[in-house]
Amino acid sequence: MARSGSRSDNGLTGIQLEHIGKRFGEVTVLADLSLQVSRGELCCLLGPSGCGKTTALRIINGLLEAETGRIFLHGADITNVPPQKRNLGMVFQSYALFPQMNVFENVAYGMRRRKLPADIIRQKVTEVLGIVRLPGIEKRRIHELSGGQQQRVALARALVIEPQALLLDEPLSNLDARLRADMREEIRRIQRELGMTTIYVTHDQEEAMSIADRIVIMNRGKIEQTGTPRAIYENPATEFVSSFVGNINLFNGTIENGKLSCLGAHFPIDPAIMNPGEVTCALRPENIQFISGGSIRGVVREVSYLGSIIRYKIGLQHSTETISVQTPATDAAYVIGDTIGMTFDPKDLRVFPRNQ
């Protein structure tokens, strides 16, 4: 490992990872991972199971040791600093609350280990329970709380020590869908209120899209793309990102003589975008429109009513391929067996090299 030290702090960087590498046996979990999170930013690490996102979080917190690279917090090198001295708040997937302690004792735990005066501890516990909207429950036992209340207590315990940054490892995965949505809003409110630098790990794309200032898409120990939720969704940099974030149609195409051939139709394409040859095309279901004279023809195979939207599965004529189309529920509805025409704006199409 690199030796500890510091670097010039411009006052803007909260957490910085430089060339982090980690292996478990023969398996490379993180490969030369570099990341910078600004102060006050909520950054989501998003990716499938095994992509390295939780490993990265535990390396930042000091629960795991990286084999290569350095970690900086507000400009200070904390690579070799013990976990308890890194001044980071951590919320685990399991909450890690102490069942034998009441709420007050759980929240006060970190401050008591730091030997703060009793009156200061009481004051801070009261303040932080107010922030997470759980006033007056100091004497309640953990088993008396709902899942959402336990999550708030875990968050209060992480915040009460006034950390320089907050780390959350899939904190909502044990809650039902409605409570997850409510807690996302609460975490975002608290993070903004405190201006807390936050790294939030999740495999749930909706969770990341709704809560993050910036999303980091991880795959096989590497970063595939970094950007705002909108940039990630509308301009995926790789085929993996396009298929992992949101619903999307992936289908084969061919570029030749300045034209893209796909879905039985032909479209002009800028030669600078992609070399001639076979490609994979990506198109969001909501970017396809039904139109009677559309050059793409198909037959409705499935219809799913989803409240505000209707999702269709369309079998393409003269092809074994199917595509999904999503329309507002207020639009004219089609039924299984209908033959329809479709079109889309070529600017909404993303093209990637085949087998990228």
Regions found by a protein language model. Name each.
Residues L33-C44:
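Pre-Walker A (P-loop) beta-loop-beta motif of ABC nucleotide-binding domains
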Residues A2-R3, I248, K259-Q356:
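Non-catalytic connector elements of ABC transporters
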Residues L42, P83-G89, Q93-F240:
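ABC ATPase nucleotide-binding domains
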Residues G69-D77:
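Conserved ABC transporter NBD signature motif
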Residues L46-P48:
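The feature captures the beta-strand-to-loop junction immediately N-terminal to the Walker
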Residues Q16, Q36, F72, G341-T343:
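ABC ATPase nucleotide-binding domain
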